Amino acid sequence: MIVNGKTLLEYAPIKDMLGHKVRGEITSHGLSEAGYDIRIKQDIIFHEFGVAHEVDGVRGMGRFTLASAIEEFHMPNMLVGIVHDKSTWARMGLSVFNTVIEPG
């Protein structure tokens, strides 16, 4: 089922879900008409040749890392979530592999 922002707010699949969009200095988060923008929990760290370093300024290409969301999901049985890229993340050199948040 595809639902709009109002219906998504009624289902409340995210703990402490915001009912509006908050625009930050670089990215935004919260509810919009087309979905919910989540936030990355931690600083992004890339590991290269056994040495970890924080990305600052120039973004390296072709490296992978894992990140967590600040938001905590509790999907109802009739709703599935899909995580897509955000253009503001892409402008910072981050690309997200699309993933599914399973129902239930």
Role assignments for model-derived ranges:
Residues M1-G104:
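Non-catalytic terminal segments and appended small domains
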